A protein has these predicted regions:
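Hydrophobic positions on the alpha1 helix immediately C-terminal to the Walker A/P-loop
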Residues: 48-52
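Conserved Walker A/P-loop ATP-binding site and its immediately adjacent core
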Residues: 63-87
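Flexible, charged surface loops at secondary-structure boundaries
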Residues: 28-31, 59-64, 125-128, 144-146
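Walker A (P-loop) phosphate-binding loop of P-loop NTPases
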Residues: 41-46
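Inter-Walker segment of RecA-like/P-loop motor cores
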Residues: 84-145
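Short hydrophobic/aromatic beta-strand immediately N-terminal to the Walker A/P-loop
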Residues: 33-38, 68
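Histidine-anchored nucleotide/phosphate-binding helix
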Residues: 53-59
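Pre-Walker A adenine-sensing motif
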Residues: 1-33
Length: 147
């Protein structure tokens, strides 16, 4: 993916995407505690909504407001572990938006975390709070939480 120089004139730079496929303005305007998006394939649910809005909200909340990434099957999660945030990492948006503080997102034990890699792809710093949690509906009985 080509790196993009983001600035105030870059189209859609707030969301890290040059695509104008934004189907979630109505959902975000509700300011609900839980937003659920259901729709047909390839209509802009995951990429702009989860990836950019979720990561952006996490960063803007001083790294406290994580989000849940829910799929129907755990096999769907396994396929997305590496690629889910590839768009905001590969084009340089994450580094730009955090002013160089973070430039990568990695998956570990059902959670995604921010981290900074150096030019040799060695880890310099890791975020302790996860940016997102992974859940599969078919595994819901295995999850633990408060009663």
């Amino acid at each position: 993916m080509a790196r993009i120089d983001f600035d105030d004139r870059t189209i859609c730079n707030e969301y890290g995407s040059l695509y104008k496929k934004r189907n979630n303005e109505l959902i975000n305007s509700k300011e609900a505690d839980i937003n659920m998006i259901v729709g047909r394939r390839s209509n802009g649910k995951t990429y702009p909504t989860s990836t950019f809005d979720g990561v952006k909200r996490f960063i803007d909340s001083n790294y406290t407001d994580a989000f849940a990434y829910v799929r129907r099957y755990d096999s769907d999660l396994k396929a997305m572990q590496v690629d889910l945030f590839k768009g905001c990492i590969g084009n340089g948006w994450l580094s730009w938006y955090t002013k160089g503080k973070w430039n990568d997102i990695y998956y570990y034990r059902g959670k995604w975390y921010l981290r900074r890699l150096n030019d040799d792809h060695e880890v310099e710093e890791k975020m302790k709070n996860p940016v997102a949690y992974a859940f599969a509906i078919n595994r819901c009985e295995a999850y633990k939480g408060p009663d």
